[in-house]
Amino acid sequence: MPAPIRLRELIRTIRTARTQAEEREMIQKECAAIRSSFREEDNTYRCRNVAKLLYMHMLGYPAHFGQLECLKLIASQKFTDKRIGYLGAMLLLDERQDVHLLMTNCIKNDLNHSTQFVQGLALCTLGCMGSSEMCRDLAGEVEKLLKTSNSYLRKKAALCAVHVIRKVPELMEMFLPATKNLLNEKNHGVLHTSVVLLTEMCERSPDMLAHFRKLVPQLVRILKNLIMSGYSPEHDVSGISDPFLQVRILRLLRILGRNDDDSSEAMNDILAQVATNTETSKNVGNAILYETVLTIMDIKSESGLRVLAINILGRFLLNNDKNIRYVALTSLLKTVQTDHNAVQRHRSTIVDCLKDLDVSIKRRAMELSFALVNGNNIRGMMKELLYFLDSCEPEFKADCASGIFLAAEKYAPSKRWHIDTIMRVLTTAGSYVRDDAVPNLIQLITNSVEMHAYTVQRLYKAILGDYSQQPLVQVAAWCIGEYGDLLVSGQCEEEEPIQVTEDEVLDILESVLISNMSTSVTRGYALTAIMKLSTRFTCTVNRIKKVVSIYGSSIDVELQQRAVEYNALFKKYDHMRSALLERMPVMEKVTTNGPTEIVQTNGETEPAPLETKPPPSGPQPTSQANDLLDLLGGNDITPVIPTAPTSKPSSAGGELLDLLGDINLTGAPAAAPAPASVPQISQPPFLLDGLSSQPLFNDIAAGIPSITAYSKNGLKIEFTFERSNTNPSVTVITIQASNSTELDMTDFVFQAAVPKTFQLQLLSPSSSIVPAFNTGTITQVIKVLNPQKQQLRMRIKLTYNHKGSAMQDLAEVNNFPPQSWQ
């Protein structure tokens, strides 16, 4: 049989192929020759054939038939054969294939070989693809090589030990004695790998972390020697001595100093020295400075040192390299909550990043800009962010508009400024705002009594001939319906009033009704606005009747139903029309400690509940009717029942005008005292369960299995169930939240929503902190009334802070045991 071609010739031949098909033909031909050689047990050219097979594997062609040949090469006594065999094993084998277990004995023999290079090959292979079984069998040999005096083997053994610990964490203590002397080594390779090993052990075990904290002075001394040493050609990179080792030591110091005052104090001086002495003209220096900043911000460092770190990030923002600017913005975003004033000094530079061409930098700059907004700079920051909203790409508009809404609501210097800002957003990016923007703005306008004339005039001007921004048109239609009389009378004092007739107002609302751009919801707003104007205008009532009657035969069912109801109001209940269509009362939002909305899985938003304060005296029949006619839309999610009954005024004629069905919102519990003079609507019996001192639960709870409702990112939520004695329709769910990560989860908030056929009562949690390492749990009780015995479903939302970041997640719970609801 002729000698096979060499690897170099194969590469040259393959590169001459002009098409993919021609290349495949060459590969298949060579693979056939290699298979034939393997079948004939040709030991002479086995090494050459496996090398060619590895090249084909790198090109993406199948090479699995060479796995056993790699094992044969590993068993060979020739170093060249072993080298190719081990390389082939690392490329073609992994722990999912049983073939790799056949290597265990060969690797063990080679770990005890007299030649260091053979031992090095075995260590590399074990550290690359060793399974847990192999690691368990060979850990003793690795630990022995970790204690050898040979630096070449010690650095490889340290990295192999890292892999062993990752695969078999319980073997960690085996390597503890050997690691103590690793930091005394002068060889930088050994130092580097030993720091990697120490880092892995500290991250995986709190006991190891506490044990190695006493090494902080030694690590500080090594780092100081690196930055103070002179030129060393062996380790120098762009004028900096071994930056890779410096970065590794800084990362280990960050882990050791976290939540420990003594360790942090010991490393403060060296961190300041690194931050001030490192050259920033080259990227190598910037990498070290970045790690230094992360370490300073993560440990309990001095305030002056933290300011120095933030100033370094501020200098990064001026760098021409986009990657450096991006990491600076990301780091500032993480630290802005703890060092707000120091970050504020770089506000102008951050705002300039909004004009960057890179979309990633632009997004980070936008997020950081919103984090910097406060009551002192709200006007200037909003000016910049509104300019950004005008010119940014469509993918930014939704987040930017949402951020402006939240900032304006929190820091608005005046109601007029607040209204103007939101109207500017709706005019610029109305089609990108969240669903709750419209009711929130309406609530703001309603509460600003002195701004009604100004607002309705501004909105009227804003939608003249332009209906493209539907949320803006909806708010304008609502305001014109409520305050159209102020628009016509020209009572605006804040700016020059305009002359508008009743017919002109109706013209624009009718234009909204017939516009192709108007959605069904917008048409509903417009039709209701026209109906409300029948009590505010005097000369156009007949025209309003005609418009309403026309839409009584609309193909839009929602619009048709409204028109029919309004026609009935004209014909049968005209004497009640003025009272039913009077102005909306002041609306107040509920204030909760948790988030104010639940973002649904389809991306829509469920607004937070509105709490209506009880009237000062006596029933008020018109208020309920007005609420029913406040056609802002309903929801099919049931409310969270308060722990104390709330008052609800009786309504005369409200049932006739229930145009929406139940208006149900979900949110956190909120109690409102009820005046004695207001008649009460009876609440479900389970509302008083929490106030009773009698045993409320029967023995069937013992047969209800608990479930895991959520398990992700170390957070686990478990549900246990009990059934009420007094009312079998009530299921009491106790949630237990546990945290398996190494850091506490703070500001924990659990929210839940159930379908409309259920009623839900969410009691207060036992705490807002979920302790780390499963050392404690948060408990919270949910009571669910299920009178129809339907299958229980629940949507939950979890929000908490972890590792300095705000976390939020949604989940659907559909695996409730039948015993909990049948």
From Swiss-Prot:
One Gene Ontology term of the biological-process aspect is: Golgi to lysosome transport
Q: What is the effect of changing residue 35 to W?
A: In USRISD; does not rescue morphological defects in a zebrafish animal model
SUPFAM superfamilies linked: ARM repeat, Clathrin adaptor appendage domain
Query: Where is the protein situated, by its record's location annotation?
Result: Golgi apparatus; Cytoplasmic vesicle, Clathrin-coated vesicle membrane; Cytoplasm; Cytoplasm, Perinuclear region
Q: Which InterPro entries does the entry mention?
A: Adaptor_Complx_Large_Subunit (IPR050840), AP1_complex_gsu (IPR017107), ARM-like (IPR011989), ARM-type_fold (IPR016024), Clathrin/coatomer_adapt-like_N (IPR002553), Clathrin_a/b/g-adaptin_app_Ig (IPR008152), Clathrin_app_Ig-like_sf (IPR013041), GAE_dom (IPR008153)
The answer, when asked if Protein biosynthesis is one of the entry's keywords, is no
Q: What is its main location?
A: Golgi
GO cellular component annotations of the record = AP-1 adaptor complex; clathrin-coated pit; clathrin-coated vesicle; clathrin-coated vesicle membrane; cytoplasm; cytoplasmic vesicle membrane; cytosol; early endosome
How is it placed in the membrane, per its record?
A: Peripheral membrane protein
GO molecular function term, any single one: small GTPase binding
Result of mutating residue 15 to Q?
A: In USRISD; does not rescue morphological defects in a zebrafish animal model
- Region feature Disordered, mapped onto this chain: 597-628
Which UniProt keywords are listed?
Answer: Coated pit, Cytoplasm, Cytoplasmic vesicle, Disease variant, Golgi apparatus, Intellectual disability, Membrane, Protein transport, Transport
Q: Which family does this protein fall into? A: Belongs to the adaptor complexes large subunit family.
Q: What does this protein do?
A: Subunit of clathrin-associated adaptor protein complex 1 that plays a role in protein sorting in the late-Golgi/trans-Golgi network (TGN) and/or endosomes. The AP complexes mediate both the recruitment of clathrin to membranes and the recognition of sorting signals within the cytosolic tails of transmembrane cargo molecules.
Q: How does it assemble?
A: Adaptor protein complex 1 (AP-1) is a heterotetramer composed of two large adaptins (gamma-type subunit AP1G1 and beta-type subunit AP1B1), a medium adaptin (mu-type subunit AP1M1 or AP1M2) and a small adaptin (sigma-type subunit AP1S1 or AP1S2 or AP1S3). Interacts (via GAE domain) with RABEP1. Interacts with SYNRG/gamma-synergin. Interacts with EPS15. Interacts (via GAE domain) with AP1AR (via coiled-coil domain). Interacts with CLN3 (via dileucine motif); this interaction facilitates lysosomal targeting.
Name of the protein = AP-1 complex subunit gamma-1
The organism is Homo sapiens
